[in-house]
Amino acid sequence: DFAPSFSIWTTIEECLNPPLMWEDGRGWYTTEPFSDLEVFDFPEGIGPVECVNVEHEEVVLIPQKIDAKKVAFKYGLGAQFITTLKTIHMLGMDRKDTVDVQGVAVSPRDLLAAALPDPATLGSRMKGKTCAGTLVKGLDKEGKPRAVYMYNVVDNAWSMANYGDQAVVWQTAINPVIAMELIHKG
């Protein structure tokens, strides 16, 4: 079954819009949705997942604050999820403009959102873990190649039991909450 853990509107915007990339000397540019597919072996038992470039604001922010050679943002969507989103696009169900359906103006995207389960109701049916991380590649102090993966893994059963929220929502919300607490405390 296809049931995004986030709003289908957000899912479509992030996954089907041309992803923004940044490279030193080239600046910002876009590429094709689902480009640069790679299988990434996620930690803590999650394992290998197909990851692709998606549109996300970090690609705008990071090069403004950090001296980087390349910045990209990827989601580990998996082959079935990617295929489903490509099919939604191929059928025109990602369109915002309305079409006439028996005298009623309907946005295909709104119809899709109405037909899919409400992501807010999915938490108790979701299983497994989610991982958010940053892979940084470069050179160490001796000039040797080094890669560091900083990440956070959340188990859906844990987030549901402790917070009543599914893991993807919890993981999205926790960083701004921590930032607000730090700012509040000075």
Where are these predicted regions, by residue range?
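C-terminal catalytic/substrate-binding lobe primarily of soluble NAD(P)-dependent oxidoreductases
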Residues: D1-G186
